[in-house]
UniProtKB/Swiss-Prot annotation:
Cofactor(s) listed in the protein's UniProt record: Zn(2+)
Name of the molecule in the record: Intron-encoded endonuclease I-PpoI
Key word Hydrolase present: yes
Keyword Zinc: yes
Quaternary structure, from the entry: Homodimer.
GO term, biological process aspect, one: intron homing
Gene Ontology MF annotations: endonuclease activity
Gene3D superfamilies hit by this protein: Homing Intron 3 (I-ppo) Encoded Endonuclease, Chain A
Role description: Mediates the homing of a group I intron in the ribosomal DNA. Makes a four-base staggered cut in its ribosomal DNA target sequence.
Keyword list, A-Z: Endonuclease, Hydrolase, Intron homing, Nuclease, Zinc
InterPro entries: Endonuclease_Zinc-binding_loop (IPR008704), His-Me_finger_sf (IPR044925), Homing_endonuclease_His-Me (IPR044930)
Amino acid sequence: MALTNAQILAVIDSWEETVGQFPVITHHVPLGGGLQGTLHCYEIPLAAPYGVGFAKNGPTRWQYKRTINQVVHRWGSHTVPFLLEPDNINGKTCTASHLCHNTRCHNPLHLCWESLDDNKGRNWCPGPNGGCVHAVVCLRQGPLYGPGATVAGPQQRGSHFVV
């Protein structure tokens, strides 16, 4: 059953109200170019579901659960702000990217909607002060960035990513 725009907007409104309830965690992180910075992530605790309406989906992933017309829809909570965006860009599947590289973060300012190739490429990014070339700039250096890393990052081949 397809959702109406009103139903989608209701889900987004509910998500925006809920995301403010997540604890704000401060991280001191590498920004590239030898610089450090501070990021403020809204994190869901890993020990137990956070509040009514959340269900655990793996050790570090949670989904928001909402009933619409007596049908329970499970929304990937990172993708909720992007429900009105296209499912693909130039024929490539899209996903929510964490600009902060923190998979538990739900801060809307730390998320962007892009192709899975671009998302995976962020892992090799030198960071905002190290020469990030992404259309939406990373907030910190990628966790796999280091000697020999390329800014281009991997490309998807089947279900695997290769550099």
